[in-house]
Amino acid sequence: MTEQNEELKKKLTPLQYEVTQNNGTEPPFRNEYYDLEAEGIYVDIVSGKPLFSSKDKYDAGCGWPSFTKPIDEEEVIEKEDRSHGMFRTEVRSKQADSHLGHVFPDGPGPNGLRYCINSAALRFIPKADLEKEGYGKYKALFD
């Protein structure tokens, strides 16, 4: 195991590590953010890069946080995923290469996409804490 992996194992919970580093999936409806309605942004649990906004979050009924789009499409990578006998599109964070979840073509809105993301891959920054946490420029998303 590399030194970087050892550091991540210390930093992350076992579930966060399994999801982000081993392409795991947390249980639906039993995760931290699937029903969170507070305003704020969701950042990569590994790198801290802003990924999704509560403005683009909606209840898809699937049991995981669902978003219509990322804050910045340049910060996510989409890859073909044929695991488990399915054809899906995996979503990974660009900077940390963390497994985030999958994107499906069954969402609402103009792009018709549903980013189905594991809570364990994210950290939520409430709108009130954006400045304090170093994400002040994202307050404009909520004006």
From Swiss-Prot:
It is an enzyme of class 1 (oxidoreductase). InterPro entries: Met_Sox_Rdtase_MsrB (IPR028427), Met_Sox_Rdtase_MsrB_dom (IPR002579), Mss4-like_sf (IPR011057). Keywords: Oxidoreductase. Its EC number is 1.8.4.12. It comes from the Bacteria. Residues 5-127 form the MsrB domain. The active site is at C116. Belongs to the MsrB Met sulfoxide reductase family. PANTHER family: METHIONINE SULFOXIDE REDUCTASE, PEPTIDE METHIONINE SULFOXIDE REDUCTASE MSRA_MSRB. This is Peptide methionine sulfoxide reductase MsrB. The lineage of its organism: Bacteria, Bacillati, Bacillota, Bacilli, Bacillales. The gene is msrB.
